[in-house]
A protein has these predicted regions:
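Helix-turn-helix DNA-binding elements, focusing on the entry/boundary residues of the two helices
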Residues: 14, 25, 38, 53-56
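DNA major-groove recognition helix of helix-turn-helix
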Residues: 32, 45, 55, 71
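Short alpha-helical DNA-recognition segment
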Residues: 22-43
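A short, Lys/Arg-rich alpha-helix, primarily the initiator
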Residues: 1-20
Length: 80
């Protein structure tokens, strides 16, 4: 898996967690107290940016999950 593919997988994971919690991107921004905007959330979720570990940490706090949840990728690597 190359970097671009990995970023997309992580972004999909962030998005699925957010949606499972019935939160909008704007809700997440509000919980992060202005540290990030909806454009950046969208870019993370689409895999178009490589966020810092601090951003991922703050995102995990906003979504009330452990940061490791973003990187739990076993389901993406299972053979069909």
């Amino acid at each position: 898996m190359n970097k671009s593919e990995y970023l997309k997988v992580v972004g999909e994971r962030v998005r699925s967690i957010r949606l499972a919690k019935n939160l909008t991107q704007l809700d997440v921004v509000g919980r992060m107290t202005g540290e990030i905007d909806t454009t950046n959330i969208s870019r993370i979720e689409c895999g178009r940016t490589n966020p810092t570990i601090f951003t991922m940490y703050r995102l995990a706090e906003a979504l009330e999950v452990q940061i490791s949840e973003f990187f739990n990728l076993e389901d993406f690597f299972q053979e069909p």
